[in-house]
């Protein structure tokens, strides 16, 4: 019996040693959903600082299918950090995990404002794999196109279709009006617009727009966090965290999967109910991990416009949809 026990211990130790040797022998690791830099560094017996150094990471942000170097030495300048050029003129850079507009600008001796202008960006959010122009002139697709000319209809007034990179102030300057006037014409109560949206730019406000949205916050007491976004890149949780930060109502980075957000938010002191407001978080437990969305607008007919990721498109792709009034109560709202 004693010999069998000793043999079993030796066998187990041998298996563990082989597994450890295989892990240590690996030079790269492909990130899996839910993994963190801590878990990966622990797996390969290296420090978080070493892992970040090997991969030129400036934050703890990683995303599924990203290939990380786990041994060897870091490259002072990787191929991806060198801008590519094309026949159309100008140079391009592919965004890496941990990049920011300011960091990219400093690499290529320009300003983040210039990169935003070159790429028609109207906010600071970029994502790994995104191709950004870092030198040259703004492409024609980012400049005014035929769609920048307002269309007219029999009901009076002119309309404009929002393009990527537009803002209310930019549109107003194109048509010799003010952003306040455009907001009034379209019944807008915030600055949020999205590509493909049709805006009235001249004429009179229609009755249907006079009360098209509500912004009543009902006096919610909202805690505010200033955490770093540690949610998995491209997921619904990642997007909603960023949108709340944009409006100055940052949330915790430790609520985990979407199906836990209502309970975690309640524990942190947030109000949870079934009444959507602009800026609130729509949450459901439906699905394996649940889902969260950001409420962009509450319409007069009871429907809501939401923005989300990883719902009707691949992770990292921002989409919008209108939730019908009869489905609004299917969600809980974090204020």
UniProtKB/Swiss-Prot annotation:
GO terms for biological process: cell wall organization; defense response to bacterium; division septum assembly; killing of cells of another organism. Peptidoglycan hydrolase involved in the splitting of the septum during cell division. Residues 211-335 form the Peptidase C51 domain. One of its GO terms (cellular component) is extracellular region. SUPFAM superfamilies: Cysteine proteinases, LysM domain. It comes from the Bacteria. Keywords: Antimicrobial, Bacteriolytic enzyme, Cell cycle, Cell division, Cell wall biogenesis/degradation, Hydrolase, Repeat, Secreted, Septation, Signal, Virulence. Residues 1-25 form the signal peptide. InterPro entries: CHAP_dom, LysM_dom, LysM_dom_sf, Papain-like_cys_pep_sf. It comes from Staphylococcus aureus (strain bovine RF122 / ET3-1). Its EC number is 3.5.1.28. Its main location: secreted. Residues 71-90 are annotated as: Disordered. It catalyses: Hydrolyzes the link between N-acetylmuramoyl residues and L-amino acid residues in certain cell-wall glycopeptides. This is N-acetylmuramoyl-L-alanine amidase sle1. One of its GO terms (molecular function) is lytic endotransglycosylase activity. It holds the Pfam family CHAP. Residues 71-86 have a biased composition (Low complexity). Residues 27-70, 91-134, 158-201 form the LysM domain. It is found in: Secreted; Cell surface.
């Amino acid at each position: 019996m004693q010999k069998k026990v000793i043999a079993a211990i030796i066998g187990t130790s041998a298996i563990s040693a082989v597994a450890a040797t295989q892990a240590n022998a690996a030079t790269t690791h492909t990130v899996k959903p839910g993994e963190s830099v801590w878990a990966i560094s622990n797996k390969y017996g290296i420090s978080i600082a070493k892992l970040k150094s090997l991969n030129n990471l400036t934050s703890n942000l990683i995303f599924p299918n990203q290939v990380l170097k786990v041994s060897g030495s870091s490259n002072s300048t990787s191929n991806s950090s060198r801008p590519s050029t094309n026949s159309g003129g100008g140079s391009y850079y592919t965004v890496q995990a941990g990049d920011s507009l300011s960091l990219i600008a400093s690499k290529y001796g320009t300003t983040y404002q210039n990169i935003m202008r070159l790429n028609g960006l109207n906010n600071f959010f970029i994502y790994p794999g995104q191709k950004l122009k870092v030198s040259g002139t703004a492409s024609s697709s980012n400049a005014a196109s035929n769609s920048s000319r307002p269309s007219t209809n029999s009901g009076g007034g002119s309309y404009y279709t929002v393009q990527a990179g537009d803002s209310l102030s930019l549109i107003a300057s194109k048509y010799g009006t003010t952003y306040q006037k455009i907001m009034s014409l379209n019944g807008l109560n915030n600055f949020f617009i999205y590509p493909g949206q049709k805006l009235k730019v001249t004429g009179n406000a229609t009755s249907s727009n006079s009360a098209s949205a509500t912004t009543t916050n009902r006096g919610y007491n909202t805690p505010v966090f200033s955490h770093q976004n540690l949610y998995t890149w491209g997921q619904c949780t990642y997007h909603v965290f960023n949108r709340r930060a944009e409006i100055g109502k940052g949330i915790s980075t430790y609520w985990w999967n979407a199906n836990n957000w209502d309970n975690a938010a309640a524990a942190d002191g947030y109000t949870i109910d079934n009444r959507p407001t602009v800026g609130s978080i729509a949450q459901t437990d439906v699905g394996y991990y649940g889902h969260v969305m950001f409420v962009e607008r509450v319409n007069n007919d009871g429907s809501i416009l939401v923005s989300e990721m990883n719902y009707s498109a691949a992770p990292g792709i921002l989409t919008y949809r209108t939730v019908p009034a009869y489905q609004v109560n299917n969600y809980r709202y974090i204020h």
